[in-house]
UniProtKB/Swiss-Prot annotation:
A Pfam family the protein falls into: SH2
GO annotations of cellular component type: cytoplasm; mast cell granule; protein-containing complex
Location(s), subcellular: Cytoplasm
Quaternary structure and partners: When phosphorylated, interacts with PLCG1, PLCG2, GRB2, VAV and LAT. Interacts with LBR and AGO2. Interacts with FGR. Part of a complex consisting of CLNK, SKAP1 and FYB1. Interacts (via SH2 domain) with FYB1; this interaction allows SKAP1 and FYB1 to promote tyrosine phosphorylation of CLNK by LYN. Interacts (via SH2 domain) with MAP4K1.
Species, as recorded: Homo sapiens
Modified residues (Phosphotyrosine): Y69, Y96
Record GO terms (molecular function): protein-containing complex binding
Entry remark concerning the domains of this protein: The N-terminal proline-rich region interacts with the SH3 domain of PLCG1.
Post-translational modification: Tyrosine-phosphorylated upon BCR cross-linking. Tyrosine phosphorylation at both Tyr-69 and Tyr-96 are required for BCR-induced calcium response and are essential to restore PLCG2-mediated signaling in BLNK-deficient DT40 cells, but this phosphorylation is dispensable in cells expressing LAT. Interacts with the SH2 domain of PLCG1 via phosphorylated Tyr-96. Tyrosine phosphorylation is increased when complexed with SKAP1 and FYB1.
Region (Disordered), start-end ranges: 1-22, 135-198, 244-271
Protein name: Cytokine-dependent hematopoietic cell linker
Disulphide bond pairs: none
Function field: An adapter protein which plays a role in the regulation of immunoreceptor signaling, including PLC-gamma-mediated B-cell antigen receptor (BCR) signaling and FC-epsilon R1-mediated mast cell degranulation. Together with FGR, it acts as a negative regulator of natural killer cell-activating receptors and inhibits interferon-gamma production. Acts as a positive regulator of both T-cell receptor and natural killer T (NKT) cell receptor signaling in CD4-positive NKT cells. Together with MAP4K1, it enhances CD3-triggered activation of T-cells and subsequent IL2 production.
């Protein structure tokens, strides 16, 4: 009874030891309680022969069971450890994940029919192979081979992208539908010359000039030619450059007349807009270089003699007596200089405020021009003596007393009328 009890306890102890996965030592210690002290005491006791044999049997059974058992989880771990996952290749900035494979597929010269046939036939082949794989029984070896084979296929094989639809332009870039034939203009209207296309701007310029001129000139004083030409302005083809240049020159001439002091009133016939004149009339033969009116060059003595304000060779005393008798401010005349030199050929005599001012007219050989005075009045140059007289009829002349060397005391006067010769001066 005691032996059976010992066997039972020994077997249960051996099962516990097997579960804890270690073998019994050769010498083991059993705890015993001391009755006197009530504490555990460990005593070493050698194992019996049958206990040694039992432990050896248990160890052999354990090793045999480990060899026969096939664990699929361990196999999976071994296969996954053998697979190496490499990092993804860098993509260029100009390439994207969805366009990389599409570019490779587009480079291959395949017709559209072959692409569609491949893309359509591929899903049917995949479904058939999947059905065959499901029907066959899968063994352990095949399973491991499939795992390794699928991994290699995933690593080496590049999947083809799905077929893309045809590229279509956005709605805003799509071409417009063709125009109906009724709305198309005829060919004669479509192909026009640039001169005809500039006609609206010419008409608007003429209308503007007519409106501005209508505010200044009454309607009853206009020429009938202007209204007649305005009616036929659609048939005339006048270049825009000519009309604009004539418009600017006419405005420039009007400003010059206003700047001269308004001595000559502007008549309605002279103040017509450029639209009422032909292009040949608007083109002037000369060009304005300054604010002075243009005159032909008359620098010779013979050209000066025909003017009424030129008296020739007279003494200074006789001229001053004649001015005192006339006694009109602004009266003037031109006489020959007493020195009779080429540099100072003439003298301009002006009466103002009961005093006669004698101003020399100098001739500049370098420029072939005339200048007035010694330079204190300014550095103005003229092409002829007539230019000097016409200029100071419109602008005041600066009169400086000969006794005043500093030129501080100055007076201004316009040339109004020449001194009558028959009244006060006797012919020489």
């Amino acid at each position: 009874m005691n032996r059976q009890g010992n066997r039972k306890t020994t077997k249960e102890g051996s099962n516990d030891l097997k579960f804890q996965n270690f073998s019994l030592p050769k010498n083991r210690s059993w705890p015993r309680i001391n009755s006197a002290t009530g504490q555990y005491q460990r005593m070493n006791k050698p194992l019996l022969d049958w206990e040694r044999n039992f432990a050896a049997v248990l160890d052999g059974a354990k090793g045999h069971s480990d060899d026969d058992y096939d664990d699929p989880e361990l196999r999976m771990e071994e296969t996954w450890q053998s697979i190496k996952i490499l990092p993804a290749r860098p993509i260029k900035e100009s390439e994207y994940a969805d366009t990389h494979y599409f570019k490779v597929a587009m480079d291959t010269p395949l017709p559209l029919d072959t692409r569609t046939s491949i893309s359509i036939g591929q899903p049917t082949w995949n479904t058939q192979t999947r059905l065959e794989r499901v029907d066959k029984p899968i063994s352990k070896d095949v399973r491991s081979q499939n795992i390794k084979g699928d991994a290699s296929v995933r690593k080496n094989k590049i999947p083809l992208p799905p077929p893309r639809p045809l590229i279509t332009l956005p709605k805003k870039y799509q071409p417009l539908p063709p125009e109906p034939e009724s709305s198309r203009p005829p060919l004669s209207q479509r192909h026009t010359f640039p001169e005809v296309q500039r006609m609206p701007s010419q008409i608007s310029l003429r209308d503007l000039s007519e409106v501005l001129e209508a505010e200044k000139v009454p309607h009853n004083q206009r020429k009938p030619e202007s209204t007649h030409l305005l009616e036929n302005q659609n048939t005339q083809e006048i270049p825009l450059a000519i009309s604009s240049s004539s418009f600017t020159t006419s405005n420039h001439s009007v400003q010059n007349r206003d700047h001269r002091g308004g001595m000559q009133p502007c008549s309605p016939q002279r103040c017509q807009p450029p639209a009422s004149c032909s292009p040949h009339e608007n083109i002037l033969p000369y060009k304005y270089t300054s604010w002075r009116p243009p005159f032909p060059k008359r620098s010779d003595r013979k050209d000066v003699q025909h003017n009424e304000w030129y008296i020739g060779e007279y003494s200074r005393q006789a001229v001053e007596e004649a001015f005192m008798k006339e006694n009109k401010d602004g009266s003037f005349l031109v006489r020959d200089c007493s020195t009779k030199s080429k540099e100072e050929p003439y003298v301009l005599a002006v009466f103002y405020e009961n005093k006669v001012y004698n101003v020399k007219i100098r001739f500049l050989e370098r420029n072939q021009q005339f200048a007035l005075g010694t330079g204190l009045r300014g550095d103005e140059k003229f092409d002829s003596v007539e230019d000097i007289i016409e200029h100071y009829k419109n602008f005041p002349i600066i009169l400086i007393d000969g006794k005043d060397k500093t030129g501080v005391h100055r007076k201004q006067c316009h040339l109004t009328q020449p001194l009558p010769l028959t009244r006060h001066l006797l012919p020489l």
